[in-house]
UniProtKB/Swiss-Prot annotation:
EC number: 3.1.13.4
A Pfam family that the UniProt record links to this protein: LRR_8
Family recorded in the similarity comment: Belongs to the CCR4/nocturin family.
Name of encoding gene: ccr4
Any one annotated GO CC term: P-body
SUPFAM superfamilies: DNase I-like (SSF56219), L domain-like (SSF52058)
Superkingdom: Eukaryota
Name the record gives this protein: CCR4-Not complex 3'-5'-exoribonuclease subunit Ccr4
Cofactor names: Mg(2+)
Chain sites annotated for binding Mg(2+): E352
Function: Acts as a catalytic component of the CCR4-NOT core complex, which in the nucleus seems to be a general transcription factor, and in the cytoplasm the major mRNA deadenylase involved in mRNA turnover. Ccr4 has 3'-5' RNase activity with a strong preference for polyadenylated substrates and also low exonuclease activity towards single-stranded DNA.
Lineage: Eukaryota, Fungi, Dikarya, Ascomycota, Pezizomycotina
Xref: CDD domains: Deadenylase_CCR4
Region annotation (Disordered) ranges: 18-42, 116-141
Ranges of the LRR repeats in the UniProt entry: 169-190, 192-213, 215-236, 238-259
Organism: Aspergillus niger (strain ATCC MYA-4892 / CBS 513.88 / FGSC A1513)
Amino acid sequence: MNGGQAHQRFGMQIPKFQSQSHHPHPAQQAHHHAHHNQASHSINHQHNFSSGALAAATPHFTPGPLQNGAHVNVDEDIDETMNEHWQQQLQLAAESRQASSPHYYARTVAQQTKGIQIAPSQPESQENGSGDRNGLVKSKPAPRQGWHALDFGGQGLRALATSLFHYTFLEKLYLNHNKLKTLPPAIGQLRKLTHLDLSSNDISELPEEIGMLTSLKQLLLFDNNIRTLPFEMGYLYRLEMLGIEGNPLNDVLKSQIIKEGTKALVRYLREEMPVHLPPPDRDWIILDETASSSNSPTEKITVLSHNALCDSSATPSHFGYTPSRVLSWEFRRELILSELRSHDSDIICLQEIDQGSYNGFFREQLAYNDYKGVYWPRGRAMGMQEEEAKSVDGCATFFKGSKFILLDKQMINFGQTAVRRPDAKGQDDIYNRLWQKDHIAVVIFLENRLTGSRFIVVNAHLYWDPAFKDVKLIQTAILMEEITKLSEKYAKFPPCTDKTAFRFSEAEVEYASGDQIPLFMCGDFNSAPGSAAYNLVAHGRLTESHPDLEKRLYGNLSRVGMTHPFKLKSAYNSIGELSFTNYTPDFKDILDYIWYTSNTLHVSALLGEVDKEYLQKVPGFPNFHFPSDHVALFAEFTVKGKKGKVVEADFGPQRN
């Protein structure tokens, strides 16, 4: 459907089936989904339709007499109380049984739209301010699609062509009054469906992939032979009407829907969902066999970054498809800890860790694995009562204590740093848009105890809202400015002599300039490849005329542009980036990165993709095996030859 107009164009012609790629939504939708009113008593909706024949594409296309047209009475012992839920069920079932003629719904719409002039559809706003913490810059807009519904009702179809499932733009699909015995698993590809009518067929079971249709609001299955429902239907958290009358449904499920309605049944299936088999381990992709070898003399360092999804953000309104026990912090934190321990990374950067979880769980647990930590909460924690401040999330960075010495630690509050700039005076947007956001970055400066190499490690979390792409860009610019200042300061740090336990360490390195110090910049940047924030980091400069600034006033950053001196690359750019780092029903894209300075470091191995077959039945994270809506990034690096003066190590008094 395009917009909210009462009547839409009805297209009688259907183009030949061909592969059609899925086009992402212009911007991530909000995870907040209010409980809507129950569905209308009528299923004669107005929308764009195509009802052309599928004879050439569908096997056994044989229009014929209707099947399963009669009402089936089962489970007479169940009290079918005439409450509002069951009244609506019976009314919709009666309407469905009257819709047995070929293309009934398409013809109905055609009659209703005769003589009505169609107003041009309004383009969707590209700056949608509503949403949750994981929104981001707009995706590429989808080409205009003139129709969004197909009506193959009353055609006597015995099978469905695979080509049908390439029409991923479909929002409504009518397959009622046919002779279908099964529904192909490929139905899970039609993830934009809001209405699916399979009434009056001979279907005995639904595939698990039905759970992928998380946009469904109406699923009509009247007069089939369905005895049970897959637990994956618990993912259908937007479903308002499940039409199940006329099926020999088992007593437990039927009792649920009769007494409490569709949403209660979906909730029951979700909460009773058994633990699925875990996916295969993500591949360890070796990019440099020589450097990654355990026998290699080169200095290696591993880095992991993960947005852990803090407890306060993991609400049922945001993640309605996730069982409550899986969404609980007690369950998810154990999964996170298990993954951190399994990778045993030298450096760990976590975002969205609240103070209570850092102090009361991760710092203590990871200490058993030789980790020391540095943590700062976001700015809002200042001024709060101690107990209240525990729920404020922030950034936690851990490092192996036996391998590194902590030389310095800093916190960058983007908003506060911006208002302290000399050029901030009179720049309203700094105060009205940027200062109000309390996002931060944590910076630590480390020295390798054995080699003397030093590293700057940045752990950042940027603002999410796609309507504030200028804010994300300026946050990135301020981050790069502050790292530049710190790196120059760190280049002048004296050699570390407090290494008595490692008297045979190599000589310390004195770096000639800040951009010669190896730098890792990890985090959730809430910015996709190609965005302004991404381009600033990757290319080192961005002009003052960039459209993402929208001519807003940010001092010299919007007057003369933005630059930084570092030669930064995304670790995963070596494989063309992952398919996604954030995975939910409405949004899949890349938000998280491990950036590194390519003049000082070389990426030698990476943790690969989540198994694609596993994802065919999983509409979104978190779930039983992935504790956050973000996936962890993990990479191995080698340190390139050091540049700068070498200062001899202090080995203490020597005996003759």
